[in-house]
UniProtKB/Swiss-Prot annotation:
The chain crosses the membrane at residues 10-30, 136-156. It comes from Mycoplasma pneumoniae (strain ATCC 29342 / M129 / Subtype 1) (Mycoplasmoides pneumoniae). The keyword Transmembrane helix applies. Keywords: Cell membrane, Membrane, Transmembrane, Transmembrane helix. It comes from the Bacteria. InterPro entries: MPN454_MG319 (IPR054989). This is Uncharacterized protein MG319 homolog. It is found in: Cell membrane. It is a multi-pass membrane protein. Its main location: membrane.
Amino acid sequence: MGFFKLLFKLAFLAVLTVAIAYLFLAIFYFGTVSPSFKLAQPMDVFNRFFSKEALDTVTTSGVGATVTAPKAAAASQSHALILAAEQVANNANKLDPRFPIDGSLFSQIPGYVDFLKKPNIPAFLEKVGPYLTKYIIPLGMALVSGLIGALIINFILSKITRAIIKKRRKAKRAQQSRVDDYYYDEAPRRRRR
């Protein structure tokens, strides 16, 4: 009985982990709950929050770290990112326009633009890099977030079930003590009879 209980708990945690991981991917990578199972590049996700326009707005206006744009602007930005990605694929010698360069905070980092012009990346990383950024990193992040979420939910559920079990045990003990008291009070009367 204990083995089946453990098996059921593990299966429940596995399903919960997958569900939370899927939700993580749907929010941050697919952009929809019913995706076509094509993961976006992490730079696309990065640019949703730290695009050149957003960084420029932060530096010029002096507002906080987050900048919220209207939905139409966000849609046009995502369309521009897709076009930029296609341009990069066609012309490998030019800089990747998805990376914020001119007028952004990143251009102030020493060697940032030079690195983009001629990135000195090992051959092994050049081969593995696309798989890392497109599949391994997002799936790994989703799995970790799924595990953390599943463990948190499991902890909350175990606390609730323990509280219910304790309440039932207390009620059972109270009922048993009432029954014992009744029989204890009735015993002398029976003897008299």
